[in-house]
């Protein structure tokens, strides 16, 4: 896959908000925060959006930047700043932790939005609809790398019709489908819904290995789903893990030399 021409990206940070209190990241968290941090530094327009009670909202730019930088420091670099958890908690309480749901109405493109079903109209907050309208002639992408909240068909319809967005998902695995005995009851059905939505709505799927790619293709064929373009985006190793490995090797080497020296003394 060649470089994409991206004028604007709508990156889904719902999982990052939901996982804000986790002291350490899971594998999916690591991918999610890396992509979010990467987009934060890019020159093109980016909006960080989240899902709450089946509705998509847009995070204020400063809030999104603070969320991503705090989690990146906490999970990746371990440079945890003072009051990190308190700040993350405050962001959470003002977003998906907020019990009040105030969905605003869109101001533009009434000719399109007036044709939405009640479910589609509720799926995207009016202020986000206005952003989709404003940038609809740009090369826009909705990106979700976390599995979190995937399957929101009404919202995807709005994204594609109002915003003319292309949709990209990252599929990490289909373990809950292949091995339901190893997951919580119901997780296999939930993941089937997610993967089906990826097949039906995505313009491109990112996977972490050729095996995941092959299993996704098989899943699509078995269920008579379309097979969208699939691209392997291999996952690297965190610098901190490499550093720890090198330190461990050095320590073993030093201990071995010390042991040899002691034995020679005897």
Task: Report the location of each language-model feature.
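Carbohydrate transferase catalytic cores enriched for Leloir-type hexosyltransferases
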Residues: 1-266
